[in-house]
């Protein structure tokens, strides 16, 4: 179904899978990836070698262009080449320094894991994958963060091969044997991951880190097998309220400032569902499905499921307001840390106010690469 996501009544806080659903979720916040006890991670060459299309060239140390990766795992796993740096009391990764606006410290890793839990709660069933996929397929996670989604998928499907890539090397060293991570890796640069070789490519919360969505979608398209799927999950952080005006509220001002600052950095945080669907279509995707889920900022609703979603989102957004503001407001506007903390405190105060029925929208897309003629 095609929904534009631009106005109208608040969508429900539950998304039903439009297609086959498989996967797994963590049962509570304490299991959000901090107890990842699997070991003996495979090298990406081993993972690809077990796939049906692999053919390695020992002399070149690379994979042929038949659907297999060509990637230097040693250099991609050497974080010492790009040391982290401190800014406004937070730690940022040094790879592509200054481009990405979010930190990579333990506090940020916890925040990302909270969002992962939120998504599994807001989406029915297991909340991991809605797009059709083989249980023994090859899955690629773009901007994998802590790797929690990739690890959950790898644990659910022991016959699958799951690879996560990210700018920051913050993934755990111990993870399932059928899962591996490559960082630092910039998915906006040229890939060497094998065209026509992936059964599913996944991405969540990419807004704010992408300069050209059309270019990225074309690259994703070329790396999927014919008939395979791309799934994307994004939050539109523009505040909405159906029973009052948000004019004059700190949360509205904060979003407008964040939107302006990230637009000036050429990686806007604002999400537009119409543009997303159009860009997916122009990249060649078909069978595009778009779902919207309401995310209340606090548990003001009477429905118990909506209240549960809201409690998780209240925690997630409370951890996000200052974090998302620090780099954009200080680098673009030149704001001192005290001013940033003040507006963040004002926004959080409104987010906790149950008299203000504010919500954001979670967008979920599935798009298919057509079968070859």
From Swiss-Prot:
Comp. bias (Polar residues): 67-77
Keyword vocabulary terms for this entry: Methyltransferase, Nucleus, S-adenosyl-L-methionine, Sporulation, Transcription, Transcription regulation, Transferase
Cellular component annotations (GO), alphabetically ordered: nucleus
Catalysed transformations (reactions): L-methionyl-[protein] + S-adenosyl-L-methionine = S-methyl-L-methionyl-[protein] + S-adenosyl-L-homocysteine
Subcellular location(s) of the protein: Nucleus
Signal peptide extent: none
GO molecular function, one term: methyltransferase activity
Top EC class for this record: transferase
Gene3D superfamilies attached to this UniProt entry: Vaccinia Virus protein VP39
Region (Disordered), start-end ranges: 1-21, 53-81
Keyword Transferase on entry: yes
Pfam family, one: Methyltransf_23
Annotated InterPro entries: SAM-dependent_MTases_sf
BP term (GO), one: sporulation resulting in formation of a cellular spore
The protein's Enzyme Commission number: 2.1.1.-
Function: Methyltransferase that performs automethylation. No other methyl-accepting substrate has been identified yet. Component of the velvet transcription factor complex that acts as a global regulator for secondary metabolite gene expression. Controls the expression of the cyclopiazonic acid (CPA) gene clusters. Regulates also pigmentation and conidial head morphology.
Family, similarity comment: Belongs to the methyltransferase superfamily. LaeA methyltransferase family.
Subunit structure as annotated in this protein's UniProt entry: Component of the heterotrimeric velvet complex composed of laeA, veA and velB; VeA acting as a bridging protein between laeA and velB.
Name this polypeptide is given: Secondary metabolism regulator laeA
Organism: Aspergillus fumisynnematus
Gene name as annotated: laeA
């Amino acid at each position: 179904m095609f929904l534009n996501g631009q106005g109208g009544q608040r969508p429900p806080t539950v998304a039903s899978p439009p297609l086959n659903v498989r996967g797994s979720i963590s049962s509570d916040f304490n299991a959000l990836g901090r107890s990842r006890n699997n070991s003996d991670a495979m090298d990406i060459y081993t993972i690809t070698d077990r796939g049906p299309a692999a053919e390695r060239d020992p002399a070149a140390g690379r994979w042929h262009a038949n659907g297999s990766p060509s990637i230097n795992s040693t250099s991609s796993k050497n974080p010492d080449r790009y040391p982290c740096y401190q800014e406004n009391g937070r730690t940022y990764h040094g790879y592509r320094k200054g481009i990405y606006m979010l930190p990579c410290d333990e506090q940020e890793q916890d925040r990302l894991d909270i969002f992962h839990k939120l998504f599994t709660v807001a989406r029915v069933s297991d909340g991991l994958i809605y797009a059709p996929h083989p249980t023994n397929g090859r899955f690629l996670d773009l901007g994998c963060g802590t790797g929690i989604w990739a690890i959950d998928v790898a644990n659910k499907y022991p016959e699958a091969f799951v690879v996560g890539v990210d700018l920051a090397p913050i993934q755990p060293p111990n993870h399932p044997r059928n899962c591996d991570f490559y960082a630092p890796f910039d998915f906006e640069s040229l890939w060497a991951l094998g065209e026509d070789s992936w059964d599913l490519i996944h991405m969540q919360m990419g807004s704010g880190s992408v300069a050209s969505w059309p270019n990225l979608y074309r690259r994703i398209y070329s790396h999927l097998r014919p008939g395979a799927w791309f799934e994307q999950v994004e939050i539109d952080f523009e505040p909405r309220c159906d029973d009052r005006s948000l004019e004059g509220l700190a949360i509205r001002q904060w979003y407008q400032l964040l939107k302006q600052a990230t637009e000036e950095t050429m990686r806007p945080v604002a999400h537009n569902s119409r543009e997303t669907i159009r860009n997916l279509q122009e990249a060649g995707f078909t069978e595009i499905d778009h779902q919207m889920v309401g995310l209340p900022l606090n548990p003001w609703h009477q429905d118990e499921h909506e209240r549960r979603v809201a409690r998780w989102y209240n925690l997630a957004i409370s951890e996000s307001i200052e974090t998302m503001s620090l780099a954009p407001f200080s680098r673009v506007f030149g704001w001192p840390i005290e001013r940033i903390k003040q507006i963040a405190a004002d926004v959080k105060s409104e987010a906790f106010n149950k008299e203000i029925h504010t919500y954001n929208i979670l967008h979920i897309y599935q798009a298919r690469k057509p079968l070859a003629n």
